[in-house]
């Protein structure tokens, strides 16, 4: 039976479909607010009958996260290989995308069964790495940050792990709308910088699919006392980059990302 679903994140619509014995696609609950009926910008076909015979050679590897995922360039296509100690050295999932990441197939090593729920083709880390690749194609930036909307004003609290993003989200609970406490997307729209919530939260599970014009950026750090100091220019751009997810494997994507960071800090008070 054919199943399909569409999910929109930061004005990018992902169309998910597959042909299989069950339609019980296991989309995480956090995606429920992101379901939509729009025309897909990115089409993903999920396959649950084993991995394709694609050779994953060391010389074709363009990036290794040293964790669970690696990227390869094979015959002009980008291949995501996901591994886990649970399954040994061989990938448990492979995703193959065309040059612009608009079409892809996600292959799963474990076949589905009529009783089982199908694993989410947007399961971590593929969803977030794919978003980084898409944004690097002139679309925007994926930031390690908490995003808050307060009466139509967007506040971005950027920080790496343990810097206080989730704490900031909890402080704002009941005072403003939490877009996400850990992953925010920045995009240019109508001559302004906008920020968008994503499904990929940290410890705080309050998320929103909405976007809001970005008014201020705050770079979080621990200190003995509360305080604010203005950051501008190259330093602000470098701080934003250090708290983002840049496409380190893509020279053109990095050039766009660096330019976009400059553009953001030139348009928004930090």
Residue ranges and their predicted role:
Residues 168:
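Hydrophobic positions on the alpha1 helix immediately C-terminal to the Walker A/P-loop
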Residues 1-156, 161, 171-177, 184-270:
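A noncatalytic interaction/capping subdomain that flanks phosphate/NTP-handling catalytic cores
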């Amino acid at each position: 039976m054919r199943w399909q679903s569409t999910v929109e994140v930061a004005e990018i619509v992902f169309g998910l479909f597959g042909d299989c014995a069950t339609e019980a696609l296991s989309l995480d609950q956090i995606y429920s607010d992101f379901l939509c009926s729009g025309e897909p910008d990115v089409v993903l076909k999920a396959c649950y009958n084993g991995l394709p015979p694609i050779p994953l050679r060391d010389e074709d590897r363009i990036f290794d996260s040293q964790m669970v995922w690696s990227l390869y360039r094979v015959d002009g296509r980008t291949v995501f290989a996901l591994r886990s100690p649970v399954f040994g050295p061989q990938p448990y999932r492979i995703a193959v995308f065309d040059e612009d990441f608009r079409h892809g197939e996600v292959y799963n090593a474990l076949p589905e069964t009529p009783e089982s729920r199908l694993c989410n083709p947007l399961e971590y880390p593929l969803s977030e790495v794919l978003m980084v690749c898409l944004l690097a194609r002139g679309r925007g930036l994926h930031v390690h940050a908490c995003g808050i909307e307060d009466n139509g004003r967007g506040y971005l609290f950027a920080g790496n792990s343990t810097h206080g993003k989730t704490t900031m989200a909890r402080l704002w609970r009941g005072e403003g709308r939490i877009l996400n406490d850990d992953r925010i997307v920045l995009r240019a729209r109508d001559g302004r910088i906008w920020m968008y919530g994503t499904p990929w939260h940290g410890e705080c599970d309050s998320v929103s699919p909405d976007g809001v014009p970005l008014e201020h950026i705050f770079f979080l750090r621990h200190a003995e006392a509360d305080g604010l100091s203005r950051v501008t220019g190259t330093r602000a751009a470098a701080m934003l980059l250090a708290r983002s997810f840049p496409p380190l494997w893509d020279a053109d994507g990095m050039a766009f990302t660096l330019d976009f960071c400059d553009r953001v800090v030139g348009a928004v008070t930090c």
